[in-house]
Amino acid sequence: MKEFFPSIVRRTVRFKVNPVRDLALSGATSFDWKSTGDHPLFDLEPEERGETVPSGWVYVEARMMRRGAHLVARLYIDTGAGFSDAESIVIPATRAGNIKQIIKIPRDTRRLRLSPMRSEGIVRLDFLRITEISGVERIFRMMEWVAGDIIKFRSTDRAKKYNITWGRMLTDLKGAYEDCAKLRFHSAPLDYESYVRKFDTLRQSEIDSIRRHMSSFAKRPLISILIPVCRVSISYLKSAVQSVFGQIYAEWELCLAVDKDDGPETASYLKSLSEDDSRIKVVFLSAGGSVSAASNSALGAAAGEYVVILDKNDVLSSAALYFVVAKINEADGLNIIYSDADEIDGDGVRSNVCFNSSWNPDLFFSCDNISRSATYRTSLVRELGGFRAEYEGGQDYDLALRCVKRSVSSQICHIPRVLRHFRRRGEPDSADSSVGNNAWMAKRRALSKFFSDQPGVSVSQGELPGTYRVRYPIPTPAPKVTVIIPTRDGGPLLKKCMHSIFNRTAYDNFEVIVVDNQSEKRETVDFLQSLSKRSNVAVLRYDFPFNYSSINNFAEKHASGKILCFLNDDVEAVEPGWLSEMVSHALRPDIGAVGAKLLYGDGFVQHAGVVMGIGGFASHAHRLYPATHPGYAGRARLVQNFSAVTGACLVMRRDVFHAVDGFDEDNLPVAFNDVDLCLRVREAGYRVLWTPYAVLHHYESYSRGDDQMSPEKRARFNREKNFMLYRWKTDLLNDPYYNQNLTLDREDFTIADFPKLYEPWRV
């Protein structure tokens, strides 16, 4: 077939690239580029003088390696009206950077541009060529690709979701080929507008099903919606009120407290509402200027079992109260219920969605991600004294913190649906009480008050605006840490690792146990001998086949520290506070394991927490993002909880390690043992924590592969993977620290093409 194609190919055009914007050469060759902004662009110029741009059906081939946050390539086409997103084509790529894609370029195309990514990062473009092909070749190439994917993905859920089948290949080849492109790693994610249209717009049949489901509710609590009306835009207030009237669940009341300084138009509107509907309660305040006072007055009028605090500018989805009451019926004793949220503009266009995780205490201590979408048990709010004026501007966060303090984790519930639409920042009158430095200071004081019963805890500005860093104390004298490092012929990497421990670590009370697993190279053997002469280093010999779990369990038996630090020999500390930061969290009684922020040698993220379910198994959050990138909703720069962290740098108390029986050396000798350990730590009732304030380099290769190079390794890898699937059901697990609306195909927190929607009416 490949010999046949050249005879029917018309021509191939090879292109060179010229930077247009946000690009600079990063090396001595013309292949390596640095993206300096969010929209890097190359002009594509034919290498041969006089060549015209290919058109019609073409075959695009390239090799383009990228590191950054949003790695979707797009080809822009100018047919005479200039370049625009409307005339552009997504060019999918494999994880390795290979591009082989059939597209159709209009006949009147004059120029081409390439956007390699949509973020800062690095790009290596080895070559790019476009070949005009005949209709026959197009069909054969499409069939060849689809058939290959049918065989490769035949037993996967992804192939089923996209309907990649033999039958579809025969009846809808073009559609099947386009969907096969979505199976490639760097393909275009679902945009939020499409998500809203496909998955977040209720059809009449679904509304009918919701009504039938509500008729079966054992609990039908009255929900009191509180709106403090201060300095209001009457049009936005009307939108907020209308969103309450539009609720599918009808057992609600609306309690509004009106600032005395709001104008007569607002007073007249609300007065007429209350006269027309007994569910509307309006309190007119004699004083003005305090959102806390208005909120308390609205709370005083509430008769509901639960209260919803609705900002005067915000909008509820029509099913918001239904989802809340569905959760109340699913679980007893809920105190706090919160949801996902997005932003809405004056035209009703929604954007900037934030899909929250389930209850994530340490993320909540890093940023207020739930109070504006929260529902509370009314009796608890009243028992706590309602809203406190001394935290004006941060009163909602203060209330949420006090409710959290009086609740256990099972009483805090997340609904993975977009139930709140916040007024888009920058819209007229959209500023709310949580914005601004005064609000941040009020929230910081509220957070400090939350920790006031824990001596030594301090709260300061986080790495991102509007966020917080909570520091936990280390007692004096500091507990001893045992750093455990397995190695086999680690050589220069081990030297770099040890040098950083001794010369770039501010924590003083530690010992190092290096486990030599049959090193043979003279450089490593000599270095280990020199290490053994240090008073706080022990070199242990492990003369058995490599078993990561067994090696670490063996070393732990020789440890004398209260704290264990499991460290790979290819890891290097970047800044001196890394171990102190990790130990300070590991000493917290509710924290069972602590992970660090690991960067590849070139500074891009290797590990920022482990998300279960990605790729049907697990993967590292924000992998390949720039080190300083905030990540999704700031999560690459915030202390938070994850289901697991990597064992390449993992700190935990020794008593926790014993409580979960250490690493599983029988079933997981090489792979997945760190994930399994963390999942057992969580199963034992502890939280796993990741901190961005402990930064180390991990010199693991980008192209490490899947550990299946030989038949023996392949068989062992499959045994370990199957064991994890059996023990933890990782292919079915909804990671509580992720969100089921987000993709399981990549590590970039983009929206899933087929989200696992929370639809309680279907249960």
Please place each PLM-identified region on the residue numbering.
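Conserved nucleotide-sugar donor-binding catalytic segment
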Residues: 361-448, 652, 662-665
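Conserved donor NDP-sugar-binding/catalytic core segment of glycosyltransferases
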Residues: 315, 319-351, 409, 425, ...
